[in-house]
């Protein structure tokens, strides 16, 4: 079946509110119509209000880069999914390898966050991916499959069909070393196969699977030609308006 592609820029810990506003103003008038592709930017928490306001009345969607799994309480430094929904966010990125690595987030944490995100009417973009050591040992499919199964545990079929999974091999994030087209296709298909095993083929045919890891305007077309790649989660190439817009040229 035909799945609408989704291109999401992950700014990580970059841009102040003024820079975020300038970026959004530079891109919104040049975006393709959202019948062809969904386009989002994941802004740092300090930029979300500005980014959401600047993107209002455009096809650009806004994602948070993380949230907690409780709506309120004594959780100093955390971000409430309920407040994100109240602010007008659309997506929340969870499970990024940088969160797993630097902040010791577990599969259980990510599963709780996914449930909290859905409970507040938002859509999770759930990241998964293996280290170079795991990849070279031939264990990537098993490792990533376990991440996906754990993240989706207890969700409904309808919820899983509507979310986004982002396969990002850790060895390709910000390294300039990107997966081959064949690797991206085989791993995104493996992610979809896990969904099929856990929730059925109909759900697997609907869920969107992104590839991420040193995606840029020069290589996005080859990834988007893969039957099981439904978009990209993009870091460095999403920081400048021109390169971000160039990522969308595959639509034409």
UniProtKB/Swiss-Prot annotation:
Enzyme class: isomerase
Protein localization: Cytoplasm
Major subcellular location class: cytoplasm
GO MF annotations in UniProt: triose-phosphate isomerase activity
Catalytic activity: D-glyceraldehyde 3-phosphate = dihydroxyacetone phosphate
Amino acids binding substrate: 10-12, 174, 214, 235-236
Catalytic activity, EC: 5.3.1.1
Domain of life assignment: Bacteria
Pathway: Carbohydrate biosynthesis; gluconeogenesis; Carbohydrate degradation; glycolysis; D-glyceraldehyde 3-phosphate from glycerone phosphate: step 1/1
Keywords: Cytoplasm, Gluconeogenesis, Glycolysis, Isomerase
An annotated GO cellular component: cytosol
A UniProt-annotated Pfam family: TIM
Active-site annotation: 96, 168
Listed GO biological process terms: gluconeogenesis; glyceraldehyde-3-phosphate biosynthetic process; glycerol catabolic process; glycolytic process
Signal peptide coordinates: none
Keyword Cell division attributed: no
Assembly, per entry: Homodimer.
Function (record text): Involved in the gluconeogenesis. Catalyzes stereospecifically the conversion of dihydroxyacetone phosphate (DHAP) to D-glyceraldehyde-3-phosphate (G3P).
NCBIfam families linked to this entry: tim
Family affiliation: Belongs to the triosephosphate isomerase family.
Protein name: Triosephosphate isomerase
Gene: tpiA
């Amino acid at each position: 079946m035909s799945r609408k592609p989704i291109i999401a820029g992950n700014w990580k810990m970059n841009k102040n509110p003024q820079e975020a506003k300038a970026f959004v103003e530079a891109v919104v008038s040049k975006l393709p119509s959202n019948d062809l592709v969904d386009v989002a930017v994941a802004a740092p928490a300090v930029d979300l209000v500005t980014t959401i306001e600047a993107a209002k009345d455009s096809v650009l969607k806004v994602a948070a880069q993380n949230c907690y799994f409780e709506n309120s309480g004594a959780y100093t430094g955390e971000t409430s999914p309920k407040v994100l929904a109240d602010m007008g966010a659309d997506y929340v990125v969870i499970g990024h390898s940088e969160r797993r690595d630097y902040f010791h987030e577990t599969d259980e944490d990510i599963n709780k966050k996914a449930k909290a995100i859905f409970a507040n009417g938002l859509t999770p973009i759930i990241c998964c991916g293996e280290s170079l050591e795991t990849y070279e040992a031939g264990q990537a499919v098993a490792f990533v499959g376990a991440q996906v199964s754990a993240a989706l545990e207890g969700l409904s079929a309808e919820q899983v069909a509507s979310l986004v999974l982002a396969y990002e091999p850790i060895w390709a994030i910000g390294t300039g070393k990107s997966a081959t087209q064949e690797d991206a296709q085989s791993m995104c298909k493996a992610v979809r196969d896990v969904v099929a095993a856990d929730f059925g083929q109909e759900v697997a045919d609907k869920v969107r699977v992104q590839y991420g890891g040193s995606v840029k305007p020069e290589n996005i077309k080859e990834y988007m030609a893969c039957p099981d790649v439904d978009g990209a989660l993009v870091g460095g190439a999403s920081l400048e308006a021109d390169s971000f817009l160039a990522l969308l040229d595959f639509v034409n």
